[in-house]
Amino acid sequence: MNDLSRNPDRLNISQKNKAIVDELDRTKFMNLDSGSITRSELFLFAMSLGAETVPTKLDTINPGGFILEKSIDSTTLACIYALSISKHSGTDLDDITDKSEVYKLAQEYANTGFEIIENYLSAKKNSRDLLWELMREADEQYRMLHTVPC
């Protein structure tokens, strides 16, 4: 294993999902374009969408990467590590501090999320309707988290 894979310096997305990001920039779909939000925020949004699914294994990585590590904001980094902790099933706590594994997991879920975004794009849903749908889903998840059994 080379040093780059052991100590990654960027977050990557697949080549297919790079095309989806380009389409978001072109269409300004849901204001997810680079003029409206940072790449860190877009990555986090995609990762959040993908987090409730089976992650997509990364086959073809966009060679330029998506976000250099120095550009990852603290909120995104905290969420990446929180995702790793929440998905951790082993007994070795060193796994949740292994940056290579943490980034790999985040990238897999983000790439899954970009595929979900692609489905939204191809369904040609109205951005406002989609936003309300996502808010209803978030409300439902919040209720599930905060419902105390009687």
Question: Which residues are covered by each model-predicted region?
Answer:
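Short amphipathic alpha-helical segments
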Residues: 37-47
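Short basic helix-loop element that most often maps to the first helix and adjoining turn
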Residues: 32-36
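Charged, low-complexity intrinsically disordered terminal regions and linker tails
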Residues: 1-31, 44, 56-150
